């Protein structure tokens, strides 16, 4: 997890730095519903490369936003879910969803 000194002073800039990429926001959108496996996430995010998905998941795990759970099974199973800190993003994602709906309705008039 990054230290306070490594993050921008502005809280909005901090949020953008941690989760502001297109893919991270869409990953969070999915993870707010349920835990997902890597291949499920990749299939649900049209256009994302394995490298970008891997980098995004590792970054959010390192920042304490998501949890990577490895199950001791054969074959191995790994799931990604929101951490308690990541769950605090749910109202933000829902607000973005509502804003997107409203924007589309206005543009359709």
What are these language model-derived features?
Residues 1-4:
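Acidic-glycine-rich active-site phosphate/pyrophosphate-binding loop
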Residues 6-52, 72-79:
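N-terminal helix-turn-helix DNA-binding core of bacterial DNA-binding proteins
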Residues 11, 88-109:
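Amphipathic alpha-helical dimerization/coiled-coil segments
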Residues 43, 61-62:
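Alpha-helical residues within the helix-turn-helix
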Residues 53, 57-60:
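Basic amphipathic alpha-helical segments that dock to polyanions
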Residues 72-95:
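Basic, amphipathic "hinge/linker" alpha-helix immediately C-terminal to the N-terminal HTH DNA-binding motif
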């Amino acid at each position: 997890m990054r230290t306070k000194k490594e993050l921008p002073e502005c809280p909005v800039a901090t949020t953008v730095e941690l989760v502001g990429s297109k893919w991270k926001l869409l990953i969070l959108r999915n993870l707010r519903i349920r835990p997902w496996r890597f291949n499920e996430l990749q299939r649900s995010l049209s256009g994302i490369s394995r490298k970008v998905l891997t980098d995004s998941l590792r970054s959010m795990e390192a920042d304490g936003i998501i949890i990577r759970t490895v199950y001791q099974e054969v074959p191995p199973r790994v799931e990604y879910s929101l951490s308690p800190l990541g769950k605090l993003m749910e109202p933000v994602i829902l607000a973005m969803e509502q804003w997107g709906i409203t924007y589309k309705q206005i543009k359709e008039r």
